[in-house]
Amino acid sequence: MDKKSARIRRAARARHMMREQGVTRLVVHRTPRHIYAQVIAPNGSEVLAAASTVEKEISAQVKYTGNKDAAAVVGKLVAERALAKGVKDVAFDRSGFKYHGRVQSLADAAREAGLQF
């Protein structure tokens, strides 16, 4: 089993538990250059809020989009957009990535902005 398939397997296991519980998820995906965050409805078919470093609004604020500072900006923005839609409680779906570095920075910023998970 290679590194990518192991990550996908971890993510599937966590998503299965979240789907059974029927909770709104804050999903994070990262690449070496960008980080993406989405708030997904409990049924899994609707994206309630989203933010990523690909957006001009965010890339204009940060010097480099693949670091913890950029992840914190994305976390804050996705939390603000989710709160505007009335979503306050979410489950954190880290997509099999370690809770460390950019993923942790995004989660901390989202918590500070008002999301609870």
Swiss-Prot record:
GO MF assignments: 5S rRNA binding; structural constituent of ribosome
GO BP: translation
Example of a GO cellular component annotation carried by this entry: cytosolic large ribosomal subunit
Keywords: Ribonucleoprotein, Ribosomal protein, RNA-binding, rRNA-binding
A UniProt-annotated Pfam family: Ribosomal_L18p
InterPro entries named among the record's database cross-references: Ribosomal_uL18_bac-type (IPR004389), Ribosomal_uL18_bac/euk (IPR005484)
Superkingdom classification of source: Bacteria
SUPFAM superfamilies: Translational machinery components
RNA-binding is among the record's keywords: yes
UniProt keyword Heme present: no
Stated family: Belongs to the universal ribosomal protein uL18 family.
General function of this protein: This is one of the proteins that bind and probably mediate the attachment of the 5S RNA into the large ribosomal subunit, where it forms part of the central protuberance.
Subunit structure: Part of the 50S ribosomal subunit; part of the 5S rRNA/L5/L18/L25 subcomplex. Contacts the 5S and 23S rRNAs.
Protein's name in the database: Large ribosomal subunit protein uL18
Gene source species: Actinobacillus succinogenes (strain ATCC 55618 / DSM 22257 / CCUG 43843 / 130Z)
